[in-house]
Each structure stands twice: as structure tokens, then as C-alpha cells.
Amino acid sequence: MIVFIGVDLGWYGKPTGLAALHYATSALEQHAITRLEPVAEILDWISQQIGGEDAVVGVDAPLVIPNSSGIRRAERELNAEYRRYHAGCHAANLSRPFAPNVLAFSRALSERGFAHGAEASPRQPGRFQIEVHPHSATVALFGLPRIVKYKRGRREDRSRELRRLRRLMLERLPALDPPFVPDLPRIPLSGNLKAVEDQIDAVLCAYIAAHWWKWGRQRNAVFGSNQEGYIVVPKRGAYSPPSCL
């Protein structure tokens, strides 16, 4: 068995969405989903979910930031391909206030035996961490003309888009490879959406990790490198788009 962990990291020390998927034969199974805040609790949760198994941790946050200013090559390359879909990503450099937190999290994973996996081969044994980008991944996996815009705006609009993302995941992920039937939280009719959003994002991060482990560069793109910073995204065109977006 191999375990895939999705981490929608709270960049500024805020709560983090977490998901754990297990792959034993030919399909993924969702094992756990939660939201935690203290980094020590997050790392303990990851260790408990993995036990003694091999694992890939997909993190929606910069894990390698060598540049003191400007933008990483990974972001420049991703933006060149995905900005037209409104899926570009923000610049990461050492002067950004989130840098200490995200780099400390990556170091903690490294200390626990998780090597950076941008150069790993498909189905390679071991434990790896990879940086992922859910927005561009949904464009690629679901054949979307634009991202699902559930991050900003009025609650009504965000709720509608989050429901759309949930529906796409429920309908499309079982038909992909590896197939996966997610168990996603329902979107609340009122109140804050952030907790549900973080957990759904974490499931996406875990699925991207599984997709990378199974297919490597055959069906995934790697922007950047282990040394300069990297982002793993499924390749566009690997799967047919849904009949109704």
C-alpha cells in the first residue's frame, strides 16, 4: 500500500486542510479528511496516517524558495501556460512574509524522510514531498476553459463555484487514472466556507500526488526543478473534458 497526503497549507500559520488517500490495488480510497492548525499537530497527523508505508505528500505551498526577490522559474513557466485559464500563481521569494512558515514546513517533512520528488520516477518506492497547484490541476484534469473561481468574491458566488468544483470532482475523478471516488463535505447553506474549501483543496492535493506517483512526467508537467523550486501539475489534454462544465 502507498499513502497520499494532501496539504492545503495555511501559509501564515492559519488552519490547514488535510486529506489522506490509500492506494492498495487499482483504485484510491479516501481514508481521512480534516483541518488542523498547529504545525506539530499537522505533522503528527501525517505520521499517523502513513504509519510505516511509502507516501507522497502534495502541498499547495512553495516548498523550495532559493530566490531573495522576484519570481521563481517554476511560477514563470506555469504562468506562461496557465494564465490564459486564470490559473496563474503568485510569486514566491524569500522576502515574502509567508516564506519562513512554508519553508519550515518543508524542512520538517525533509527531517521525517520526505525527499523532494520532482525528479522521482513513476511508482518509485520511498517517501516524497511535492509542491502542487490545485487551480491549474483542475483545468488540466477536468478540461476546463477557466478555473473554478471559489476563492474570492461574494459568499453567494463563492458557494456556487465551490458546489461546481465539488460536483466536478464527484463526477470526473472516478473516470480518471487512478480512479477515485471522493467523499467530500457538503457546502454549508450559511456561514463561513473556508473550512470546507480547505478540505476540498486538500483532497485535490492528495489526488495530484497520486497522479504524479502513478504517471510521473508521462501525464504530468514539472515546472522548475528540485533545486530552483518546482510545481507539479497534471498535463492538459490527458483526459477528455466533461460534456457539461
Give the residues covered by each predicted segment.
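RNase H-like (RuvC/DEDD) metal-dependent nuclease/polynucleotide-processing core
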Residues: 1-5, 9-245
